[in-house]
């Protein structure tokens, strides 16, 4: 038995679902569910951090108590009452002595003692509070990082565990966005935010308790406002959570488009779809912008109501409080004194204000909960076919007896279309069974069922008599080798790609498999041999080479079951002959299932099964089926008649078949060795390339990668906060109104302090009626200030939020537009992989909004409070003002130091996250290949390595976060101590009135306090500055390709003339020093068909890419009507080119939209034009038979067969009515019947058009007006088919050998 593989994520394994548990995929998660992946120790430490935060919050009521006692004693000792108010806290520090009928001198000395005690008490409290908050935030952040680290790993693991059916039907599976934006939001909500919220809420709770202890009557009156504040806050939080989910959904849909476009960037360029994609992306951002504005409106209204209630409550408190004080004024054992009024008022009001300050943090928690909803729904979803599950049987021996029994099946994304209808096929051990039939009949479906990508809805698939559903999924797939029609290679070395077939394979095993797959020679001729990087999706090598590496990967696996789905479709004749022999040799041991359109490759099969309409129409050996004279015989007869005609014509034109057969092995060996010395990438329609694989193979490779990373280290422009704000300049109207509102709101705090000082001054008046009248006036003023604060806060929040979301939408659109406006070389850069670009686009724009929008209003409000407070302070006492401001440099210095530190560590964290995203996105994008090769654990291991680096960088980032926030909270109270200590001395020396020192202190301390609240957003600002630098660098970048404006010199008509390659030299930007074309000269006359042939790597696809201007020549030129292609506007040039590539990319649009995509220069492509193009490509009948017809949506992993996708791609090219048609193996994926019809359609389409064709199957180009044979990047032979056959050299040899093998 195979040993159970140990989990490589022990820290995540403790959090898997229990066996047999059932999870609702639509379950709603509470905030507490966000901590489900914390350990017991972490939960204990989190509780400790919250208790520590609670202890820290107790110091705010403590400050209110000593402040109330001190201010009350100031009044008593200045007025000279009979007996001063009792004190409980100040005596601990040497003050608060209760005097009776004291002299003026005694009172003044007592004031100095009280001031000293207050200063000492403030210092002790500030230090204690600073230490406690630092500890609480540091603990919470570390715990949050641990959990996010686990959730990242678990999320990828959950994605890798999902069945293919989920990928087919999932509309929001954009991986890069979830791994960056959603997890960042989750981290925000489970880290310091929860500590800050608890700190602010417990300040309120403990303040209420203190207030009740000192004066329950007044406390009850003041508390009357609290239910309204709590109600407003809770309603806003609930609305915020609901809207946050909608906002995330909108951004998720937009991120899907980004990932899809970047993955198919060459297709977008070929059909000039940039504007259409920008429009699609922009439309998907509109709901997010509208939702964001609503969030701002609701938040503003809630905050406004809270502030209005707070000021109304203060007005009521001082009015009622004075009544209580005056009633007991002359009593020796009075309860209500100015001290009690201050303690109750400040304890309750500051607590209520803290509830208001908690609002944005509560919003972050609501957003985190919404983000957790999307993440946990995936993590908790039980996969129907889990490739990483240890359950299931693992037989010791595998004979390879396969039986498909009564199979009924329909794809999950197309439940109305039944593909297999009761199919039964028996495959004996060691047999080679071939499946043939029209495109879409279910051949490839059987291959997928064999791998358990899907389970049949009826019937069963059995291996050695065991239902596949009873076998361990990983074990089953480890027994199978697969070579698909469109093989996927990963962005690592050639050697590593082959080793993925069997991780334990030695270098000798790899080379043996490569020789069998006929790719060893071209690999060893590369400068780095098996260490050559293939690029993302194998973009750096040709299609034929990619397929041979995939074959080597399957062969090194030494499988018991071999699945070949058009395994040689991308090979040239020479390679095909050799690889076919290798495959036949490899298939002698294992049971082999073959899907083939070329019947010549399956005549030796032990059994041939002809499928039609989802059932077996015929089965038997080649000879048996020919004798039966049924469907198979008819298909073979058509093929033989076609090939006989072509062979006869070839023999007449050139040389006998036998001679070709005898010479082929010798001559083509030399040709291939010569021509594969320098390799070219194929004409890809997929993404870019990068330099990272799933795992490092040697220490030397890791050292090389480190050197390369150091060399290519990202240098980000430095951006000031002013430059950051300039990004928001188009929204200046909102910012101006919001700025005025922020200043208005900020000014209310020092104004309140000013009148609060007057209130204390009034208390010294001996006439009770005067006191009552003046206090009533001040109460009314407080109501006015409340209205001013409420209106200012609402406008501030709404205007800045609107400015922020509008800016974010604009930045996302501009960044997306800038990226797709780059040249292909930009996407070839390893730093610009699909995963990295998606991650960058999502996080950078989000980060910039994180420091703009509503947070700018909060910071501007804090500055306004401080400035107005300073003005008030200098008016009343410049000495006390200067001394009070001594703490501000400490606060500002802490922000500066944190900023410098965060900028460095955030850059490292960003780079590490991008690398991790690259690994993950590549795996998820190619999930079928990952599943087929059982690479899930390897992907996870590599991702874990990258995430560990992210974790280190993030821990450095938060190291000083607690210190800075704690300093922002503690510094204002230290400032209180300093200010009131010095103010008390000034009062004792009769240099200042006691009410004035209260005015100065309140005005300034509120400014300092507001600055402390603004410090909660310091990390957002630092992240935003870093992201803004990256965005500005991006915006400055322009394509290196010239794109001249339209002129009479480069008209559309000019692009329709002769095409001339004039002494063209070219090497790919990512492979400098490896020339592909070396002085190529080629003329393509207008309205003629020219075919480029030659073995893989000879430069054929490069010629096409230069014509499409994916790249420009290094030397020489490509001319159209005598005008160099670089003189044409890109859109003008590409508008007349119709491309059908070897591996077509279709987008997540309807079939009609995909076909109409061929003509992006018009918005009014009619349905009639679409249908006509579909008919020409022989796909109309298939589309019409679908339940939704042309409105059928093609998802990311649509269940169309290769032939169906190819025909839609052909329709897409034809709908634009191109003057130049480019066919790169356009019929390679079609069955014989479809190929014949489509070839006729292409022949008709070529009429009156210039046509450039690339083909390995030379029979498809024999009617071309000119055939050019390329070798080492130059044309070595050219002429018509007959002329080249008569020449009796390379082309004749290739052609006749293909006829013999066919």
Curated annotation (Swiss-Prot):
Alphabetical GO biological process terms: germ cell migration; renal tubular secretion; response to hypoxia; response to insecticide; response to toxic substance; transmembrane transport; xenobiotic transmembrane transport; xenobiotic transport
Residue intervals on the Cytoplasmic side: 1-46, 361-734, 1018-1302
Catalysed reactions, as listed in the record: ATP + H2O + xenobioticSide 1 = ADP + phosphate + xenobioticSide 2
Subcellular location: Membrane
Region (Disordered): 644-714
An MF annotation (GO) of this entry: efflux transmembrane transporter activity
Family that this chain belongs to: Belongs to the ABC transporter superfamily. ABCB family. Multidrug resistance exporter (TC 3.A.1.201) subfamily.
Protein name in UniProt: Multidrug resistance protein homolog 49
Gene designation: Mdr49
């Amino acid at each position: 038995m195979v040993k159970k593989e140990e989990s490589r994520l022990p820290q995540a394994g403790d959090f898997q679902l229990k066996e047999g548990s059932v999870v609702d995929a639509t379950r709603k998660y509470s905030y507490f569910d966000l901590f489900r992946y914390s350990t017991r120790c972490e939960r204990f430490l989190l509780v400790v951090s919250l208790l520590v935060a609670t202890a820290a919050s107790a110091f705010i009521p403590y400050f209110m108590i000593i402040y109330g006692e001190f201010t009350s004693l100031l009044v008593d000792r200045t007025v000279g009452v009979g007996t001063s108010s009792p004190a409980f806290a100040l005596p601990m520090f040497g003050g608060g002595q209760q005097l009776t009928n004291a002299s003026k001198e005694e009172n003044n000395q007592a004031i100095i003692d009280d001031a000293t005690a207050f200063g000492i008490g403030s210092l002790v409290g500030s230090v204690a509070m600073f230490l406690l908050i630092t500890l609480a935030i540091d603990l919470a952040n570390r715990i949050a990082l641990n959990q996010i680290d686990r959730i990242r790993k678990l999320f990828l693991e959950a994605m890798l565990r999902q069945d293919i059916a989920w990928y087919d039907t999932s509309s929001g599976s954009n991986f890069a966005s979830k791994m960056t934006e959603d997890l960042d939001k989750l981290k925000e909500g489970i880290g310091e935010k929860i500590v800050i919220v608890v700190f602010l809420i417990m300040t309120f709770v403990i303040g209420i308790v203190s207030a009740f202890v000192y004066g329950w009557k007044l406390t009850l009156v003041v508390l009357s406002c609290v239910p309204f504040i709590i109600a407003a806050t809770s309603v806003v939080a609930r609305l915020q959570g609901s809207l946050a989910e909608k906002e995330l959904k909108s951004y998720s849909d937009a991120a899907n488009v980004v990932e899809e476009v970047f993955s198919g960037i060459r297709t977008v360029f070929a059909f000039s779809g940039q504007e259409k994609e920008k429009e699609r992306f922009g439309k998907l951002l509109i709901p997010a912008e509208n939702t964001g504005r609503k969030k701002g409106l609701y938040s503003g209204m809630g905050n406004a109501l809270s502030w209005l209630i707070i000021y109304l409550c203060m007005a009521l408190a001082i009015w009622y409080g004075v009544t209580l004080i005056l009633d007991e004024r002359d009593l020796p054992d009075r309860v209500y004194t100015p001290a009690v009024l201050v303690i109750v008022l400040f304890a309750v009001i500051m607590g209520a204000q803290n509830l208001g300050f908690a609002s944005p943090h509560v919003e972050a928690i609501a957003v985190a909960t919404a983000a957790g909803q999307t993440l946990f729904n995936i993590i908790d979803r039980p996969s129907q076919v889990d490739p990483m599950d240890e359950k299931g049987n693992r037989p010791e021996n595998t004979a390879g007896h396969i039986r498909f029994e009564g199979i009924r099946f329909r794809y999950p994304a197309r439940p109305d279309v039944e593909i297999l209808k009761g199919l039964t096929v028996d495959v004996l051990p060691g047999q080679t069974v071939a499946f043939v039939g029209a495109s879409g009949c279910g051949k490839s479906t059987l291959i997928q069922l064999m791998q358990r990508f899907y389970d049949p809805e009826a019937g069963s698939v059995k291996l050695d008599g065991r239902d596949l559903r009873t076998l361990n999924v990983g074990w089953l797939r480890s027994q199978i080798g697969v070579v698909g029609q469109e093989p996927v290679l990963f962005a690592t070395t050639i050697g590593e790609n082959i080793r993925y077939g069997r991780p334990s394979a030695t270098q000798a095993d790899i080379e043996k498999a490569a020789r069998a797959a006929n790719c060893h020679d071209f690999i060893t001729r590369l400068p780095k041999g098996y260490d050559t990087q293939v690029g993302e999706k194998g973009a750096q090598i040709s299609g034929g080479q990619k397929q041979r590496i995939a074959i080597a990967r399957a062969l090194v696996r030494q499988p018991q079951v071999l699945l070949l789905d058009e395994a040689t479709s991308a090979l040239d004749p020479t390679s095909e002959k050799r690889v076919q022999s290798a495959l036949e040799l490899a298939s002698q041991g294992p049971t082999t299932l073959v899907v083939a359109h070329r019947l010549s490759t399956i005549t030796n099969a032990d059994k041939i099964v002809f499928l039609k309409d989802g059932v077996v129409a015929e089965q038997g050996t080649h000879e048996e089926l020919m004798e039966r004279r049924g469907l198979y015989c008819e298909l073979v007869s058509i093929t033989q008649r076609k090939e006989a005609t072509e062979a006869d014509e070839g023999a007449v034109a050139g040389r006998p078949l036998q001679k070709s057969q005898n010479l082929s092995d010798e001559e083509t060996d030399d040709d291939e060795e010569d021509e594969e010395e320098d390799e070219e990438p194929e004409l890809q329609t997929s993404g870019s390339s990068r330099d990272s694989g799933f795992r490092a193979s040697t220490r030397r490779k890791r050292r090389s990668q480190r050197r390369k990373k150091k060399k290519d280290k990202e240098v980000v422009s430095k951006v000031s906060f002013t430059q950051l704000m300039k990004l928001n300049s188009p929204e200046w109207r909102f910012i101006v109104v919001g700025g005025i509102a922020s200043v208005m709101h900020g000014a209310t705090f020092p104004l309140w302090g000013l009148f609060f000082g007057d209130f204390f001054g009034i208390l010294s008046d001996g006439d009770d009626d005067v006191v009552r009248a003046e206090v009533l006036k001040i109460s009314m003023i407080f109501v006015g200030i409340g209205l001013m604060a409420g209106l200012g806060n609402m406008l501030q929040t709404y205007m800045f939020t609107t400015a922020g979301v509008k800016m974010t939408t604009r930045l996302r659109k501009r960044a997306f537009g800038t990226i797709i406006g780059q040249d292909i070389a930009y996407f070839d850069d390893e730093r610009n992989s699909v995963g990295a670009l998606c991650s960058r686009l999502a996080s950078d724009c989000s980060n910039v909004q994180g420091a703009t929008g509503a947070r700018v209003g909060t910071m501007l409000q804090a500055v306004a409070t401080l400035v107005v407070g300073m003005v008030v302070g200098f008016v009343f006492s410049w000495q006390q003002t200067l001394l009070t401001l001594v703490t501000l440099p400490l606060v500002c210095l802490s922000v500066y130091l944190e900023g410098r530190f965060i900028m460095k560590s955030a850059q490292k964290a960003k780079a590490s996250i991008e690398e991790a995203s690259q690994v993950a996105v590549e795996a998820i994008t190619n999930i079928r290949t990952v599943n087929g090769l059982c690479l899930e654990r390897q992907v996870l291991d590599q991702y874990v390595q990258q995430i560990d680096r992210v974790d280190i960088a993030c821990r450095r980032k938060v190291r000083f976060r607690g210190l800075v926030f704690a300093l922002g909270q503690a510094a204002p109270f230290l400032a209180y101590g300093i200010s009131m200590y010095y103010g008390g001395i000034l009062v004792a020396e009769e240099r200042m009135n006691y009410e004035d020192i209260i005015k100065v202190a309140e005005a300034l301390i509120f400014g300092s306090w507001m600055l402390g609240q603004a410090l909660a957003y310091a990390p957002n600002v630092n992240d935003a500055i870093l992201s803004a630098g990256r965005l500005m660098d991006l915006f400055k970048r322009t394509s290196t390709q010239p794109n001249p404006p339209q002129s009479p010199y480069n008209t559309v008509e000019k692009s329709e003339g002769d095409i001339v390659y004039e002494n063209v030299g070219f090497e790919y930007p990512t492979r400098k020093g490896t020339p592909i074309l070396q002085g190529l000269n080629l003329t393509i006359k207008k309205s003629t068909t020219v075919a480029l042939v030659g073995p893989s790597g000879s430069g054929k696809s490069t010629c096409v890419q230069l014509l499409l201007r994916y790249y420009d020549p290094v030397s020489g030129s490509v001319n159209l009507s005598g005008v160099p292609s670089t003189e044409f506007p890109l859109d003008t040039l590409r508008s007349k080119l119709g491309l059908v590539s070897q591996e077509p990319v279709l987008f997540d649009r309807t079939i009609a939209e995909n076909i109409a995509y061929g003509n992006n220069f018009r918005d009014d492509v009619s349905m009639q034009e679409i249908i006509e193009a579909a008919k020409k490509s022989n796909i109309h009948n298939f589309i019409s038979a679908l339940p939704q017809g042309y409105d059928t949506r093609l998802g990311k992993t649509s269940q169309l067969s290769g032939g169906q996708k190819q025909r839609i791609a052909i329709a897409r090219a034809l709908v634009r009515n191109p003057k130049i048609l480019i066919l790169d193996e356009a019929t390679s994926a079609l069955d014989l019947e479809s190929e014949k019809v489509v070839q006729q359609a292409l022949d008709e389409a070529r009429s009156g058009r210039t046509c450039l064709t690339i083909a390995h199957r030379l029979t498809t180009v024999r009617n071309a007006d000119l055939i050019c044979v390329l070798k080492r990047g130059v044309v070595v032979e050219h002429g018509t088919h007959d002329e080249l056959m008569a020449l009796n050299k390379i082309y004749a040899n290739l052609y006749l050998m293909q006829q013999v093998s066919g």
